[in-house]
From Swiss-Prot:
One of its GO terms (biological process) is L-phenylalanine catabolic process. CDD domains: PAL-HAL. It catalyses: L-phenylalanine = (E)-cinnamate + NH4(+). InterPro entries: Aromatic_Lyase, Fumarase/histidase_N, L-Aspartase-like, Phe/His_NH3-lyase_AS, Phe_NH3-lyase, Phe_NH3-lyase_shielding_dom_sf. There is a cross-link at A198-G200 (5-imidazolinone (Ala-Gly)). Belongs to the PAL/histidase family. It comes from the Eukaryota. This is a key enzyme of plant metabolism catalyzing the first reaction in the biosynthesis from L-phenylalanine of a wide variety of natural products based on the phenylpropane skeleton. The active site is at Y104. It comes from Phaseolus vulgaris. This is Phenylalanine ammonia-lyase class 2. PANTHER family: HISTIDINE AMMONIA-LYASE (PTHR10362). One of its GO terms (molecular function) is phenylalanine ammonia-lyase activity.
Length: 712
């Protein structure tokens, strides 16, 4: 309901109640229609708009995230149509006070002491702000106990939006003042801890009220990071020279809401939605470099499971893999000796849609829950003008925040667990289908341990992430003289989810660098294998085709079998010393010649037709030529003069690779270079924190029509 200027209440006509949906279930379900990817695209578009217009009911998490991050260049505007409504409720409070009406927080004490009474409404609000200023900032210590700048801006925006609906009893001028602080990039200092998000986020929100009322302990941070007192903040924001003298109910209206928890939750969920899509694309790239079998994305499999998150995750991966040069090449490899190879891929690859789907559903549902919360009226009491009464309820209870954030954090931890499993397979030469151990790229693997340190770091990240997955909401303590005996812990859960999100970014960054390393190693592998095949072919033709007198020799029939050895053998299993007798290449090439010799029968007794006699000359010439040609191929690779181009350029995953390699300036890591894995991962992490990964990520899916491929 919205209060109207003439003091009447009017139901807001929405799609929900117009369609006979008094319980709001249909509206909640409708909000989840369409694909998750389309929703993420809409979020990104909203995030990039230059202005946020507040009216009380249409605020989105993307707008909250944008306001939090864009402290310059983004303008917050208040709907002028809300002014009369807000004023009507404010006037009602003053009139009821004059009439002697007994209302909670207006004429009574607070919480467990609401049995106390007073007629000094303004003084009561002033005392409310004073006793709620119970936070600790730890000034001058190494511990930073101040709420992050972004979270405070988010809280300010959300609180203004909820108060605009006109049920709380506050002057429109106070909302304008908060908006001016936002638009002039002046951020009150709020304590990091001290709220249980039960009667709202009382303690942190009291510091916004403290700044507005000019409390001497209130501080703000200015546009250049300077510390401001209340007077300086007002002057810089062009609010005026006079602080607000709170009228009855206004202090309670400012502090008795869930804006800090839901504001931070909005920031978290905006990024969580993007990282969820990234995890889908990363899983597809993982399948490419691991030479996976793409049938794990077949729509029939997922259609039969019914879960929309799983179906969409599989369809996105299917889209990335459809037409992939890696998948085409892998198919040919799988056709070689198929009975000697695993029939299906390991779980981290094959069940990635089933694993990610529920996490995406949880994140998406949490997004809608928080979006409802930031558009809700969530203080107490609420004023119903038409009924001429203050309604005493509990909308300040931030349970939707605590539950949504606990669930989101568990989903984030599950995404991280999958990434770690995939990363572990990628760096393990027992499982990665021919890539070198630890993704080493040097000529001498004994002096290059590649991503070994990165895998240890990933284990650390994953362990901390799993710990953070534990629920916050199960640790409720009875508070405020047992009045707040159940409380949501919404902000605490939001903070912990924000920590989890940071760790998932660390994991995503590290994994992306490793995947780009694997892509480059596949490119190097292809060129090295091609070089080895050419050399083996040349040497075979020169040494095995003819006998000593120029006649055709029986060993000439060995060439095709020799080339099959090169095709079958993992290149990195021998390439650091290709002619070593302890490595498989030379052993298996010799075995081919020996097998042909054994089948040569009586011809072996004749020196002119003996294949055994050819083995020494074949190996001697190979040992002379092969190391030089392999080094030449490596040099050509290092100088971007490869005979075979990189397959990634023909894949839908190329935009992400291009972003990491070209825009961020990362390169193939080797023990021969000074640069460390952490330096490259840092570049990706920083770019991710700045939102730069969004465009290349969405470009990978630019051609997807929102549907799986037809079942053939």
């Amino acid at each position: 309901m919205d209060a109207t200027p003439n003091g009447k209440d009017a139901f807001v006509v929405t799609a929900a109640n117009a369609a006979g949906d008094p319980l709001n279930w249909a509206a909640a379900a409708e909000a989840l229609s369409g694909s998750h990817l389309d929703e993420v695209k809409r979020m990104v578009a909203e995030y990039r708009k230059p202005a946020v217009r507040l009216g009380g009911q249409t605020l989105t998490i993307a707008q909250v995230a944008a306001t939090a991050a864009h402290d310059q260049g983004l303008k917050v505007e208040l709907a002028e149509s809300a002014r009369a409504c807000v004023k009507a409720i404010s006037d009602w409070v003053m009139e009821s006070m004059d009439k002697g009406t007994d209302s909670y927080g207006i004429t009574t004490g607070f919480g467990a002491t609401s049995h106390r009474r007073t007629k000094q409404g303004g003084a009561l609000q002033k005392e409310l702000i004073r006793f709620l200023n119970a936070g600790i900032f730890g000034n001058g210590t190494e511990s930073n106990c101040t709420l992050p700048h972004t979270a405070t801006r988010a809280a300010m925006l959300v609180r203004v939006n909820t108060l605009l609906q006109g049920y709380s009893g506050i002057r429109f001028e106070i909302l304008e003042a908060i908006t001016k602080l936002l638009n002039n990039n002046i951020t009150p200092c709020l304590p990091l801890r001290g709220t249980i998000t039960a009667s709202g986020d009382l303690v942190p929100l009291s510091y916004i009220a403290g700044l507005l009322t000019g409390r001497p302990n209130s501080k703000a941070v200015g546009p250049s990071g300077e510390i401001l007192n209340a007077k300086e903040a007002f002057e810089l924001a062009n609010i005026g020279s006079e602080f607000f003298e709170l009228q009855p109910k206004e202090g309670l209206a400012l502090v008795n809401g869930t804006a800090v928890g839901s504001g931070l939750a909005s920031i978290v969920l905006f990024e969580a939605n993007i990282l969820a899509v990234l995890s889908e694309v990363i899983s597809a790239i993982f399948a490419e470099v691991m030479q996976g079998k793409p049938e794990f994305t077949d729509h029939l499999t997922h259609k039969l499971k019914h879960h929309p998150g799983q179906i969409e995750a599989a369809a996105i991966m299917e889209h990335i893999l459809d037409g992939s040069s890696y998948i085409k090449a892998a198919k040919k490899l799988h056709e070689i000796d198929p009975l000697q190879k695993p029939k299906q891929d390991r779980y981290a690859l094959r069940t990635s849609p089933q694993w990610l789907g529920p996490q995406i559903e949880v994140i998406r549902f949490s997004t809608k829950s928080i979006e409802r919360e930031i558009n809700s009226v969530n203080d107490n009491p609420l004023i119903s003008v038409s009924r001429n009464k203050a309604l005493h309820g509990g909308n300040f209870q931030g349970t939707p925040i605590g539950v949504s954030m606990d669930n989101t954090r568990l989903a984030i931890a599950s995404i991280g667990k999958l990434m770690f499993a995939q990363f572990s397979d990628l760096v393990n030469d027992y499982y990665n289908n021919g890539l070198p151990s630890n993704l080493t790229a040097s000529r001498n693997p004994s002096l290059d341990y590649g991503f070994k340190g990165a895998e240890i770091a990933m284990a650390s990240y994953c362990s901390e992430l799993q710990y953070l997955a534990n629920p916050v909401t199960s640790h409720v303590q009875s508070a405020e003289q047992h009045n707040q005996d159940v409380n949501s812990l919404g902000l605490i859960s939001s903070r912990k989810t924000n920590e989890a999100l940071e760790i998932l970014k660390l994991m995503s960054s590290t994994f992306l660098v490793a995947l780009c390393q694997a892509i480059d190693l596949r490119h190097l592998e292809e060129n090295l294998k091609n070089t080895v095949k050419n050399v083996v072919s040349q040497v075979a033709k020169r040494t095995l085709t003819t006998g000593v007198n120029g006649e055709l020799h029986p060993s000439r029939f060995c060439e095709k079998a020799l080339l099959k050895v090169v095709e079958r053998e993992y290149t990195f299993a021998y390439i650091d010393d290709p002619c070593s007798g302890t490595y498989p290449l030379m052993q298996k090439l010799r075995q081919v010649l020996v097998d042909y010799a054994l089948a040569n029968g009586e011809n072996e007794k004749n020196l002119n037709t003996s294949i055994f006699q050819k083995i020494a000359s074949f190996e001697e010439e190979l040992k002379t030529l092969l190391p030089k040609e392999v080094e030449g191929a490596r040099l050509a690779y290092e100088n971007d003069q490869c005979a075979i181009p990189n397959k990634i350029k023909d894949c839908r995953s190329y935009p992400l690779y291009k972003f990491v390699r070209e825009e961020l300036g990362t390169s193939l890591l080797t023990g021969e270079k000074v640069i460390s894995p952490g330096e490259e991962c840092d570049k990706v992490f920083s770019a991710m924190c700045q939102g730069k990964i969004i465009d290349p990520l969405l470009e990978c899916l630019g051609e997807w029509n929102g549907a799986p491929l037809p079942i053939c």
